UniProtKB/Swiss-Prot annotation:
TM annotation in the entry: 11-31, 74-94, 108-128, 136-156, 185-205, 239-259
Protein name: Putative ABC transporter permease protein ORF2
Localization (cell): Cell membrane
Pfam families per UniProt: BPD_transp_1
Family to which this protein belongs: Belongs to the binding-protein-dependent transport system permease family. MalFG subfamily.
Main location: membrane
Domain ABC transmembrane type-1: 69-260
GO biological process: transmembrane transport
Protein topology in the membrane: Multi-pass membrane protein
Length: 275
């Protein structure tokens, strides 16, 4: 009994230390965003601001922040919706239909996870120019969706394969069509996996930098990760303003998590147990 208590004590100590370590970058970002440039350079980097100021946030909001935010919301939200629709349909086909090329097609799609996504930059750039989508927010949606599909299809297919076939057979006996089987039965049962896929892709695409850099050039077409450039000069950078920009960029994802944390945690836990 004492051994179990001792183990639990060290376990909680480890979690507390790990939480503190994980929070250090966030605390640095938050503290620095309320400092002036002179205070940051002259004082202790890690100390709490002596004279907190919201001037950095005012500077950020007076710039193009809301334009970058709008572009990010458009690109990410449309991409995630398309990813969920396409990957769930593909997973439904791979998990429920038996056809000649089922395993081959599924293997080819999964093999896409092994391809470094940035090797496609030049072909995508050339294609985007040819179809006149370069330097638009919509130029990002195609690559975002295509490059996210292999992992998404893999997660959803493996999840749907665990759903008992008896449910499908009972639905067919009751006259359920294939579309209703997909939309009314498998999709609700796959909600945990869909939530996991949505979180995974939404978080990654919100912070995606390279494709946004290559496929857009105008300041009015940039997404949030590119907006940091507004505070970088030739001989230095406004670090407090950059930290304020990052803090504001984090808020939408943080707010979404706060209001949906119950569903997110239940979905991810259920997905882990189901798999």
């Amino acid at each position: 009994m004492s051994f179990i208590k001792e183990t639990k004590k060290w376990y909680f100590i480890f979690l507390a230390v790990w939480t503190l370590i994980a929070d250090v970058p966030f605390l640095f970002m938050l503290f620095t965003s309320f400092k002036t440039q002179s205070e940051l350079l002259s004082g202790n980097t890690w100390q709490i601001p002596r004279q907190p100021t919201i001037g950095n946030f005012s500077t950020v909001l007076e710039g193009n922040f809301f334009t970058y935010l709008k572009n990010s919301v458009i690109a990410v939200s449309i991409s995630v919706v398309l990813i969920l629709i396409i990957s769930s349909m593909a997973a439904f086909a791979f998990s429920r239909f038996k056809f000649a090329l089922n395993n081959l097609l599924y293997s080819l799609i999964i093999a896409g996870m092994a391809i470094p996504i940035h090797v496609t930059l030049i072909p995508i750039y050339v294609l985007t120019n040819k179809i006149k989508l370069y330097d638009t927010v919509f130029a990002l949606i195609g690559p975002y969706v295509a490059l996210s599909l292999p992992m998404s299809i893999f997660i959803l297919t493996e999840f749907m394969r665990e759903i008992p076939l008896e449910l499908e057979e009972a639905a067919k006996i009751d006259g359920c069509s294939m579309f209703r089987l997909y939309s009314d039965i498998l999709l609700p049962l796959s909600a945990p996996a869909l939530i996991t896929v949505g979180i995974y892709n939404g978080t990654y695409l919100w912070n995606e930098f390279v494709f946004a850099l290559v496929l857009t050039s105008s300041p009015t077409r940039r997404t949030l990760p590119l907006g940091i450039w507004d505070f970088q000069a030739r001989y230095g950078s406004d670090i407090p303003a950059i930290m304020a920009f990052l803090t504001l960029s984090l808020l939408p994802m943080l707010i979404a998590y706060i209001f949906g944390q119950d569903k997110i945690i239940k979905g991810m836990m259920a997905g882990a147990v189901k798999g």
